[in-house]
Amino acid sequence: MKIGCVVLAAGNARRFGSNKLQVQVDGESLIRRALETVPSGLVTVVVSQYPEILSLAGEYGFEAVWNDQPDLGLSRSVRLGLEQLTDCGGVLFLVADQPWLKRDSVEALAALWAQHPAKIAAMAHGGVRGNPCLFPARFYPELLALNGDRGGSAVIRNHE
């Protein structure tokens, strides 16, 4: 089954004060670290309002999707990314500001999901569910209907 990936990289970083995805962690920008976690073989789109991030996405062979209205919140990026991947049986959502996330962890999540493709799979840390998460196609209508600063966690809560 074909799996797509949406890298969410359009946030305004209001509390941070600048584009935090360009901050260096161990000599590498947050965005580059995020793009390195994408498992090979996934159809991947990167959603951002930042031209430099969209350019970097192209260097990785990923599709760059311009978010021209980031103030509409996370739901706008979810929608823009998912609209490019509706032919996939599942879509993995990665947020770009998790510097310690490793590709092997994301690959393990995708492998787990492949064993139970009708269910949502999400990473957890310390017993708290978070990102990344992988949704089967049956949840696409709900994800596309999100609004404001709501993401996949709202859909997950609807199905607990």
Positions of PLM-derived features:
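Catalytic-core segments of class I nucleotidyltransferases/pyrophosphorylases
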Residues: 125-160
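Nucleotide and nucleotide-moiety/phosphate-recognizing core
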Residues: 2-129, 160
